[in-house]
A protein has these predicted regions:
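Ligand-binding loop in jelly-roll beta-barrel domains
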Residues: 16-35, 144, 148, 156-184
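C-terminal amphipathic alpha-helical segment
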Residues: 37-119
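Intrinsically disordered, low-complexity coil segments
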Residues: 48-55, 97, 136-143, 167-174
Length: 184
């Protein structure tokens, strides 16, 4: 077992055996989360159809990278966070994914309206701290919309600049979003 806490970032490249454990909320950021998952065990959980979710021990065992020991995981995959910017208004952290992944992730902490740029990629974001925020277009290309804690939202690349503002019960409080983009 590897202890984790809220906002830890765990990199899980293909072939790494893992499970979330009890009482954990997991935000999985992946290009193919269900296509290539080989479940070795699923704790008796059922799918939307009410039937046990499939496990595939034989195929899964062929996918395991057996050199990924507990020590290797602790040294290489746990919370490799780098602070890119830290001002009174904004903290930006590169949380990254494993170097083999083509997705880049950054976490943003702020307590007032903050401008973002799509950086020539579709943006997938999730509100990971705070109760709600409003997403607005700088140029009016879309109607403002409110997102709530743990909700995921997408901003198309063609939008360019957009703003995120804490609102409602999060107004004037620090919130955080994690943003995933395709590395260019």
């Amino acid at each position: 077992k590897i202890p984790i806490k809220k906002h830890d970032h765990v990199l899980i490249p293909a072939g790494t055996i893992h499970c979330s454990g009890s009482d954990a909320m997991v935000l999985e950021i992946s290009a193919t989360p269900y296509i290539f998952t080989m479940k070795l065990w699923d704790w008796g959980r059922v799918g939307l159809d009410g039937k046990p979710r499939p496990v595939n021990i034989e195929r899964g065992s062929h996918s395991i990278q057996y050199d990924r020991t507990t020590k290797w995981v602790k040294d290489n995959l746990i919370s490799d966070i780098k602070v890119l910017e830290d001002t009174k208004d904004l903290k930006v952290e590169k949380t990254g994914l494993h170097e083999l992944e083509f997705i880049e992730t950054k976490r943003y902490w702020f307590d007032k309206k903050t401008t973002f740029n799509t950086e020539e990629s579709v943006n997938m974001l999730n509100l990971i701290e705070g109760e709600e925020a409003v997403i607005t277009s700088v140029d009016g290309s879309f109607e403002p919309y409110v997102v709530h804690y743990a909700e995921t939202f997408i901003v198309p690349e063609c939008v360019g600049e957009y703003e995120i503002t804490p609102c409602g019960r999060s107004e004037n409080k620090q919130i955080a979003v994690i943003k995933a983009t395709v590395q260019v």
